[in-house]
Design a protein with these regions (language model features):
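Face-selective signature of the C-terminal outer-membrane beta-barrel domain
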Residues: 1-92, 105, 169
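Outer membrane beta-barrel strand-and-loop segments of large Gram-negative receptors
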Residues: 5-15, 53-65, 163-206
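Membrane-spanning beta-strands of outer-membrane beta-barrel proteins
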Residues: 7-9, 59-61, 93-95, 138, ...
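Membrane-embedded beta-strands of outer-membrane beta-barrel proteins
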Residues: 10-14, 64-66, 98-100, 143, ...
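Residue-level signature of outer-membrane beta-barrel architecture
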Residues: 16-20, 68-70, 94, 102-105, ...
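Short coil turns and loop connectors of transmembrane beta-barrels in diderm outer membranes
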Residues: 21-22, 72-78, 108-109, 151, ...
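Membrane-embedded beta-strand positions of outer-membrane beta-barrel proteins
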Residues: 27-29, 80-82, 100, 114-116, ...
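Surface-exposed extracellular loop regions of Gram-negative outer-membrane beta-barrel proteins
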Residues: 37-44, 90, 108-153, 172-199
């Protein structure tokens, strides 16, 4: 038996980002147009002949952020901000993502920082995790796939040694993940069964 398998995919982004600083304030805006082709499978040969009907996705994403830094003493700095975003691909989604950060200088060679916030993402990356092949691809949130987001808290320590020639960074974090997706199919599903991109996706949280 002989056969050829093609799994074509691509992502193309075109956008603009602008930033402005004024004293302790920072602000900015961004607009991005995403053009994606999720995994488009083609099989030819005497084992099977198959071509998926994966459709190209066009998405538009806009966002704006505002950030403020406030010293709280000689060693402590607070950073407070928020990002608002809008997105459209078959359906429109809007999100507000606040964040809070504290930086504390333990000494000239040691620093701690604490991060809390919400993060949101409109693009997903998945693939055949068991294939051992470069099969990773991107696809966009749409009417059937809601954007993923996470609540997170992280504590990080940075330490410098030998007159700051060496740096050690240690971090511990916890995330509450929502609307996660993973591809549960593999190469054998494509070759020996009816493969469906939407049917192969697992939805969950973590």
């Amino acid at each position: 038996y002989s056969f050829q398998v093609g799994m074509r995919s691509y992502i193309f982004d075109l956008g603009y980002k602008g930033n402005l600083s004024w004293g302790r304030w920072k602000m900015g805006a961004e607009v991005i147009r995403h053009q994606l082709l999720p995994q488009n499978v083609e099989i030819s040969g005497n084992l099977a002949n198959y071509q998926s009907d994966t459709q190209r996705q066009n998405a538009m994403e806009t966002s704006a952020y505002l950030q403020y830094c406030q010293p709280l003493g000689e060693k402590l700095l607070m950073e407070l901000g928020t990002r608002a975003s809008g997105y459209h691909c078959q359906k429109s989604y809007y999100r507000v993502m606040p964040h809070l950060k504290f930086d504390y200088n333990l000494s000239p060679s040691a620093k701690l920082n604490l991060n809390l916030g919400i993060r949101n993402q409109y693009l997903f990356q998945t693939g055949f995790s068991s294939a051992g092949l470069p099969t990773e691809f991107w696809f966009a949130a749409d009417a059937d796939h809601r954007p993923q987001y996470a609540y997170h808290v992280a504590l990080q320590g940075e330490f410098w040694f030998a007159e700051k020639e060496y740096r050690l960074s240690v971090e511990t974090y916890y995330k509450w993940l929502k609307h996660q997706m993973e591809n549960s199919s593999n190469m054998f599903d494509i070759l020996f069964s009816s493969y469906s991109f939407d049917g192969s996706l697992l939805h969950g949280k973590g």
